[in-house]
Amino acid sequence: ITYTDCTESGQDLCLCEGSNVCGKGNKCILGSNGEENQCVTGEGTPKPQSHNDGDFEEIPEEYLQ
């Protein structure tokens, strides 16, 4: 399954290495090998839902507090 760099929630929370999320005001840059993603300053850009249900990974509730 390939995940996009942002979640579909529109909350500017991006999936980064180790399932960590970038906080508001940050965006995720995908590493070339898919393992060295970095959170950097900048607004995230949520991608539209595609035809594949698994394109987006749910954010664990512990990150949404």
Curated annotation (Swiss-Prot):
Residues 39-65 are annotated as: Disordered. One of its GO terms (cellular component) is extracellular region. GO terms for molecular function: serine-type endopeptidase inhibitor activity. It holds the Pfam family Hirudin. Residues 1-3 are annotated as: Interaction with thrombin active site. Keywords: Disulfide bond, Glycoprotein, Protease inhibitor, Secreted, Serine protease inhibitor, Sulfation. Residues 55-65 have a biased composition (Acidic residues). It is found in: Secreted. Glycans are attached at residue 45. The keyword Disulfide bond applies. It comes from the Eukaryota. The modification Sulfotyrosine is found at residue 63. Disulfide bonds join 6-14, 16-28, 22-39. Its main location: secreted. Residues 55-65 are annotated as: Interaction with fibrinogen-binding exosite of thrombin. Belongs to the protease inhibitor I14 (hirudin) family. Hirudin is a potent thrombin-specific protease inhibitor. It forms a stable non-covalent complex with alpha-thrombin, thereby abolishing its ability to cleave fibrinogen. This is Hirudin-2. It comes from Hirudo medicinalis. The lineage of its organism: Eukaryota, Metazoa, Spiralia, Lophotrochozoa, Annelida.
